[in-house]
UniProtKB/Swiss-Prot annotation:
Keywords, comma-separated and alphabetical: ATP-binding, Cytoplasm, DNA replication, DNA-binding, Lipid-binding, Nucleotide-binding
Ligand binding (ATP): G154, G156, K157, T158
Keyword Transcription regulation on entry: no
Stated name of the protein: Chromosomal replication initiator protein DnaA
Gene Ontology CC entries for this record: cytoplasm; plasma membrane
Similarity comment text for this entry: Belongs to the DnaA family.
Annotated stretches, region: Domain IV, binds dsDNA: 327-446
Subcellular location: Cytoplasm
Region (Domain II) location: 93-109
Domain notes: Domain I is involved in oligomerization and binding regulators, domain II is flexibile and of varying length in different bacteria, domain III forms the AAA+ region, while domain IV binds dsDNA.
Lineage start: Bacteria, Bacillati, Bacillota, Bacilli, Bacillales
Location of the region described as Domain III, AAA+ region in the Swiss-Prot/TrEMBL record: 110-326
Subunit structure and binding partners: Oligomerizes as a right-handed, spiral filament on DNA at oriC.
CDD domains given in the database record: AAA (cd00009), Bac_DnaA_C (cd06571)
Amino acid sequence: MENISDLWNSALKELEKKVSKPSYETWLKSTTAHNLKKDVLTITAPNEFARDWLESHYSELISETLYDLTGAKLAIRFIIPQSQAEEEIDLPPSKPNAAQDDSNHLPQSMLNPKYTFDTFVIGSGNRFAHAASLAVAEAPAKAYNPLFIYGGVGLGKTHLMHAIGHYVIEHNPNAKVVYLSSEKFTNEFINSIRDNKAVDFRNKYRNVDVLLIDDIQFLAGKEQTQEEFFHTFNALHEESKQIVISSDRPPKEIPTLEDRLRSRFEWGLITDITPPDLETRIAILRKKAKAEGLDIPNEVMLYIANQIDSNIRELEGALIRVVAYSSLINKDINADLAAEALKDIIPNSKPKIISIYDIQKAVGDVYQVKLEDFKAKKRTKSVAFPRQIAMYLSRELTDSSLPKIGEEFGGRDHTTVIHAHEKISKLLKTDTQLQKQVEEINDILK
């Protein structure tokens, strides 16, 4: 059979004819052939989402295409780059049971390669937590010990913990770094008691340089596990080993947490992560799009960022959903398509976020005024009056301050905005024609 790279390139040429251009560009173009073993062709996808999408939507089509090219029935398997090492020919172990031995740090699969300081987007809601995490990574057990990070789901706590682990290992390859969830700690502890291996369990977690333990709130109510973790904490702290803990709430709010554990969690630094603001959400989307090789218009990223303000996971998930929807219906990505793609996951009760630009555009459409005229020095009634209406609506429909509104209207003073608001408010009480025009503008903005 021909070289697998040549075979796959031939298959791609055929697949390009069978699927839409957006589908090919999004899902197939960036794939490569990894290997061919025992009638199984392994294809490398650029990321996890693409791998899953290819498996569920294109496996059959790819198999048929390869059959047409080779006359052989090949099974298709998709992998992502970091899992390729698992597919290589197994080498003899350097010593018996090497696979079961504890290594100096966790396997690559345990520390997510995507979760580094370089890929973390810094914003007002996580700036302090990021700085504290970096300080801990640069000087384990010398800056803040323990470091306790808390915040809601999907805000970046786990990302920072993995980033600390990666940084420590990169700068000290011999460091013993362990990351695990409190649930895993609990399960291993229970199993160690059952199997009479308590000593092995203690040695495993009390002889590390950095312990990263996620979701510590799950220890609540587990008295024996809390007892074990208390002694593990003490053993590490006394040896000046770094401990990093995450939770969905601060120590004082974790129910049924022993006071002695709570006090130890408060020995070091407690920092929180809050939901990202609009600017940070846009930056997160841009970084995600760049990482996935996606070309997303700015208006679409702004729309998604305005609609999804809960956490980073949902934000990135919304972006991928829009890309997938675009591919399925074979249409270019724009704000309207994004709205259609996300209609099922955006609560109906969530009000539309209206910007001053939106208001200027709507008023301009109704009164035939160019956008640039709202910021110009023109004082003719045909421009000045619509400008006052736009200022009035900006005050009513946005959270912008008076100076901010004035700035968006050519740098006018805030007193000008106040005057416009008072004037239009007064006219609306008696002028029925103006009432209808403002109602029309509101309809456009809905």
